Regions:
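Ser/Thr/Pro/Gly-rich low-complexity, intrinsically disordered segments
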Residues: 3-5
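Conserved metal-binding segment of the jelly-roll/cupin
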Residues: 184-198
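Non-catalytic, conserved peripheral segments adjacent to functional cores
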Residues: 9-182, 215-224, 236-244
Length: 244
């Protein structure tokens, strides 16, 4: 952790004078072992029902995945000459199953659209996590990182009707843990995220979750690491029943 970072503040920015921390941000290990993670405070996120109104600015509720448009961002010009109007956004989309599974206290995921393999979080402090029986009753997921895609949007649509939660924050590189909210869905509809919206993956309230995914094929990823940058984890509630 950077020097002079006071953990209780939950808001200490990264000190980029430390090259080892810079490496963790630019080249993250997306499958960290729990025993390699520090014991830190947890910032519990507010839980909000995912509706068209609450998702304004973040994305959209998806009723029909076949008809959902995926935004593709045109490649940015490097100088005063513009990118030709019929170019720079022709990479298209890629699709596949986003599969999540709780293995004891550890939430693992694979994004078959882009070949991603992740540890999304833990149901307790990662140093205490077991891949056998759950250490504690699973009532929340501790999230350790987030990212956004500047090249395009992303869709998740449940293949089985079960509740899930997606933590989100609005675009901006100066994001803080306090900017995040946890959006709850009952599993009857899906979620589309605009480009540049901070997210990680899907956090199922049940043992497993499978979601049809579609996103920009370029798959640029800009990341934030909460333990390294802010000295905390984000706690996403995982209720199985609606509280709204």
């Amino acid at each position: 952790m950077p020097p002079n970072c006071h953990i209780p503040a939950l808001g200490c920015p990264i000190d980029r004078s430390h090259p080892e921390i810079e490496m963790q941000v630019t080249m993250p290990n997306l499958k960290p072992e729990g025993n390699s993670m520090p014991d830190l405070p947890v910032l519990d996120l507010p839980l909000i029902e995912g509706t068209p109104a609450s998702l304004a600015g973040y994305g959209e509720v998806v009723s029909d995945p076949k008809r959902q448009k995926i935004e593709i961002v045109r490649w940015p010009a490097q100088g005063w000459r513009p990118v030709d109007a019929n170019s720079g956004d022709e990479g298209g989309t890629t699709e596949g199953i986003f599969a999540c599974q709780w293995v004891g206290d550890v939430l693992k995921a694979q994004n078959h659209a882009v070949g991603g393999d992740y540890v999304l979080g833990w149901s307790c402090l990662p140093s205490q996590a077991s891949e056998g029986n759950s250490t504690l009753g699973r009532h929340r997921a501790l999230m350790w990182r987030a990212n956004y895609h500047p090249d395009g949007g992303q869709m998740f649509f449940p293949l089985e009707p079960a509740p899930f939660v997606v933590p989100l924050a609005l675009p901006g590189d100066d994001v803080t843990p306090q900017d995040f909210k946890a959006f709850w869905f009952d599993g009857s509809k899906g979620l589309y995220l605009h480009p540049n919206v901070w997210h990680d993956g899907v956090f199922p309230a049940t043992d497993t979750g499978r979601y049809f995914g579609r996103q920009g094929r370029v798959h640029a990823r800009v990341s934030a690491n909460f333990p390294n940058e802010f000295g905390c984890y984000l706690g996403a509630p995982l209720p199985r029943e609606s509280a709204f």
